[in-house]
Amino acid sequence: MSKRLLLFDFDETYFKHNTNEEDLSHLREMEKLLEKLTNNNEVITAVLTGSTFQSVMDKMDQVNMTFKPLHIFSDLSSKMFTWNNGEYVESETYKKKVLSEPFLFEDIEDILRHISAQYNVEFIPQRAFEGNETHYNFYFHSTGNHNNDSRILEALVRYANDQNYTARFSRSNPLAGDPENAYDIDFTPSNAGKLYATQFLMKKYNIPVKSILGFGDSGNDEAYLSYLEHAYLMSNSRDEALKQKFRLTKYPYYQGITLHVKEFVEGKYDY
């Protein structure tokens, strides 16, 4: 039997920010299942996240997660880490692919200044950036008018593309620590993002799309989930538009993942 690939967004999907005592039993059940499937050589697991690698490690420690996904694609899947001999090691192969084109913070600042001046708006860095980043993320607070927000953000994406840069936007998620009524603005190299990471793994392991199951909860999961035949939006998602587009997990968070992974590996979604 060929291996299956399991893909998880991290914040508010694989990891619940407000995990309580009641949730822990469901978390342990999820980890036990993933450990068993991994040990039986049935699945390959990967986390695809907009968070930094260190943020993922810190959050896993918060709830004492013990299962180690084989791959973690951090910084909006612009960095790849693989579990190897008791530690995560960054992939140099993936790094070379990501950095095959120029990606300079000064250029991104110029793009943001141009749009800021044109529309009299502000873009706020989400964190302190270091040198040679592969993911620069900002907040854009809503103007109070959805159509106006879309006009500004789509202009940003177009202008960035004209400068040979890739910009994405999605609704911020307050449950994951984001501000209310805001958008995430993400700049990554062209060879990055959750869909790119998905296709990279498909090629690496020679896995067809029918053998992949993906989970997500927010706008930056839309492209990769849309690409898959078997994709679930978490029922705890706050994105009403995405809820109309994707199948919802029967249960939220850990319970939902456990149920649908079980059904997937049992062949209930095969056709």
Swiss-Prot record:
Tell me yes or no: is Hydrolase among this UniProt entry's keywords: yes
EC number in record = 3.-.-.-
Per UniProt, the keywords (alphabetical) are: Hydrolase
Q: Which domain of life is it from?
A: Bacteria
Q: Which PANTHER family match?
A: KANOSAMINE-6-PHOSPHATE PHOSPHATASE, PHOSPHOSERINE PHOSPHATASE
Classification lineage: Bacteria, Bacillati, Bacillota, Bacilli, Bacillales
Supply the name of the protein: Uncharacterized hydrolase SA2005
GO MF annotation, one: magnesium ion binding
The species this protein was found in: Staphylococcus aureus (strain N315)
InterPro entries annotated for this entry? HAD-like_sf, HAD-SF_hydro_IIB, HAD_sf, SPP-like_dom
Task: Give an example GO cellular component term for this record.
Answer: cytosol
Q: Do the record's keywords include Disulfide bond? A: no
Per the similarity annotation, which family is this? Answer: Belongs to the HAD-like hydrolase superfamily.
